[in-house]
Regions:
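Small-residue (G/A/S/T)-rich helix-start motifs and N-terminal tracts that mark the onset
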Residues: 1-86, 90-93, 159-166
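Short, basic, glycine/proline-bearing loop/turn elements
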Residues: 25, 44-45, 69-74, 96-102, ...
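Glycine/small-residue-rich loop that forms an oxyanion/phosphate-binding "nest" at active or ligand-binding sites
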Residues: 72, 80-129
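Conserved phosphate/ATP/ADP-binding segment of small-molecule kinases
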Residues: 109-166
Length: 166
């Protein structure tokens, strides 16, 4: 189930954070090189255990050890175009939840096509700014990782993306 979160309700967030801290899930991250440290620190602060790799040939195997998967398209490479779908497929085969961060989607055709294909794989969460949401819905995208759209402009598009992901 997808949820469009505008104003998070702390009563709903607290039990999730408590569960993460109790279970300490191992999260396999295929993240942009520029954000790996930040992602790892955020996961550690939440109580999860990050596992990073830049070797996409081994990523489908490494996900078999994980409890969840994060895919960030921030520095998509030719290897990523081949390794990411296989890793998502492996995670889904294990019933693992996965997060899609379509960083800077809408600025280049390869990245945009990859993000739209991944949406059809039903991520549990899509972490995107307003410009990225608009691009995922087939509307104009931004100019990089920073949003150029006003969040209120992306609400309808976010509902479309939510419907696509189930």
């Amino acid at each position: 189930m997808s949820i469009l979160v505008r104003d998070p309700d702390l009563k709903r967030v607290r039990p999730v954070l408590t569960a993460v801290r109790e279970r300490a899930p191992l999260v396999h991250c295929l993240s942009a090189a520029v954000s790996m440290g930040i992602v790892a620190d955020g996961l550690l602060a939440a109580g999860a255990r990050p596992m990073m790799t830049e070797t996409l040939d081994e990523a489908p195997h490494m996900v078999t050890l994980a409890n969840a998967l994060l895919i960030n398209l921030g520095t998509l490479s030719t290897d990523g175009s081949e390794g990411i779908p296989a890793t998502v497929e492996a995670a889904q085969g294990l019933g693992l939840p996965w997060v899609l961060d379509p960083a800077a989607v809408g600025i280049a055709p390869v990245r945009t096509a990859m993000a739209r294909r991944l949406l059809k794989r039903h991520p549990a969460v899509v972490s995107a700014n307003a410009s990225e949401v608009l691009a995922l819905a087939g509307e104009a995208g931004g100019r990089g990782a920073d949003s150029t759209a006003i969040p209120d402009e992306a609400v309808r598009a976010a509902r479309q993306v939510s419907a696509l992901t189930g």
